[in-house]
């Protein structure tokens, strides 16, 4: 070993000597781990659940879970709208197709069969007032035979059923099959064993057994499907497209890396070590018992981007060192010595940023945080250790070394211009401008909306099939797919008292006069209709009676709008959409009413329904946002102080982060 090499060896840290004096062992261990984790990565499966997607500890969700058994049809549901392309629903062919779809859905695993509802359900009935009193029956009677007379009778029954705008479209061109789901259901092969609902499989069954099958069977029928399970299924199906997009990103990165480094060897080395990092992350994800959900499937992209960034820094450093080093090994060691600690601090900062996401009490977000933290930690081994070791063997081309030397001395006009902002004369002006922009960002940030800004599923493209189906239902039905459920809790047998019904009626009126609310339905709606009917259909009697016997009789037909002991009555609020401001207005109206009217024996509790879950999620994000930012700043500042032992240097690093946070809220 030359004198220079001996001197460099003496300056090396224990970690550097341990790694570079045992390079074959390092590569062998990495290869061994890669083979094992590759096998584990092949076992990763798409996985999600309803409860992982919601903030379980939020008061809204706690109340929903507390009354889960009484709200069986108001949680995780799918709505299938069967459209008659030509004509209306009152044809023999359409009704037969609707019956077949109803029966087909009934046998799909995961469906809560007791709550399945369509025009063919015996529980869907009509009622009218006649000279003899009340008359009623099933909307589709047992005598239905598809004849013109039977179809005319069906039309009359639908008009008298109160289902127009709910199960039947306002224009009579489509009707809905309402499908409540079970998160866990008995295994058909072993009834004592419970199976978790597989959203991807369920979505595929809806496509194959319902949409594809019946659209092909009856060209005059078009099927639209919306609901949480369908949305998640579509997101998981997007995984195939994500893999394809990842391949495209790989090719683009290959071209850009080669253009930058001018060395195919180092380009391939960076790509391989970064792909190893992605592979390890997926393998470790399976080892800790996680799968890929619609959110965590984006983590490999993130790990790939971070790995490429650190890899480019390493290659650039080795290229600069190569001009003065004896060989590739020495250049790799000098670069490792120079960049390992800064790289480690940067990776730790990334990991801390992801770990702070654990503050958000949503299962999929926490799994994303853990998965991303694992992936970032893996980069320490693949890009900070394995990459320099690999380059120490294969070296860097002379062309790449020359390019690096030229870049080090070349002054680019743009960067020269930008550097003027840091000159002593201009720096005060730069700081003043930055502070003004921060103030503007904080002021505009007050108007930042937490939640969705558009109709439909923001996770999917506006022209996706799901969002088009959702738009169809919003346009053709009075009851949208966005439902906020207020749970009215009373003492047993207390939900039918005049006090409780009058309070529900007042809340429904307030909500219906709130912007963004389509309608509100509760047992009061049925009670008023029945009381009117018992008084010869006179509209003057469409109100609540103070006679308790009359009230008790009037709610007998309000099936599904109160529980078995009449201690809970859901009030269903149908919204135009689930935009942030729509949810905020509806929730604020309910909370203001509850603050004034809650008593020991009468409470208005939020919230169930998909809109209630969205509102709870928005609140959790809003409450966690500032906490996460503060934690990130504290952790980054602490790491900077430990590393640089300089308060000024720490400020120079942290203050731009704060400025960026303020400005990002403007965007």
Predicted features, each with a name:
Residues 96, 144-264, 502, 548-636:
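Extracytoplasmic
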Residues 81-84, 98-127, 505-529:
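Short amphipathic beta-strand/extended segments in non-transmembrane regions
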Residues 2, 28, 287, 304-316, ...:
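Transmembrane alpha-helices and their membrane-interface boundaries in multi-pass membrane transporters
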Residues 47-116, 496-501:
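Juxtamembrane extramembrane loops of integral membrane proteins
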Residues 2-48, 389, 403-454, 468-471:
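Signature of alpha-helical transmembrane segments and their immediate interfacial
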Residues 321-348:
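Helix-loop junctions and hydrophobic alpha-helical segments within the transmembrane domains
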Residues 420-421, 425-545:
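Juxtamembrane segments of multi-pass membrane proteins
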Residues 236-292, 359-363, 627-667:
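Interfacial segments of transmembrane alpha-helices in multi-pass membrane proteins
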